[in-house]
Amino acid sequence: MKVRPSVKKMCPKCKVIRRRGILRVICDNPRHKQRQG
């Protein structure tokens, strides 16, 4: 899980979702998981 100021899709399978006001990226590739912090 990467925590960064701006989250971006890193590949076509990445999805940007909003959970409880936190932007997250979920993907099949665990390296692509991100959270906005």
Curated annotation (Swiss-Prot):
Molecular function in Gene Ontology: structural constituent of ribosome
Keywords annotated in UniProt: Ribonucleoprotein, Ribosomal protein
One of the protein's GO biological processes: translation
GO CC annotations, alphabetized: cytoplasm; ribonucleoprotein complex; ribosome
InterPro entries: Ribosomal_bL36, Ribosomal_bL36_sp
PANTHER family given in the database record: 50S RIBOSOMAL PROTEIN L36, CHLOROPLASTIC, LARGE RIBOSOMAL SUBUNIT PROTEIN BL36C
Family, per entry: Belongs to the bacterial ribosomal protein bL36 family.
Protein name, per record: Large ribosomal subunit protein bL36
Species in which this protein is naturally found: Nitratidesulfovibrio vulgaris (strain DSM 19637 / Miyazaki F)
Lineage: Bacteria, Pseudomonadati, Thermodesulfobacteriota, Desulfovibrionia, Desulfovibrionales
Gene: rpmJ
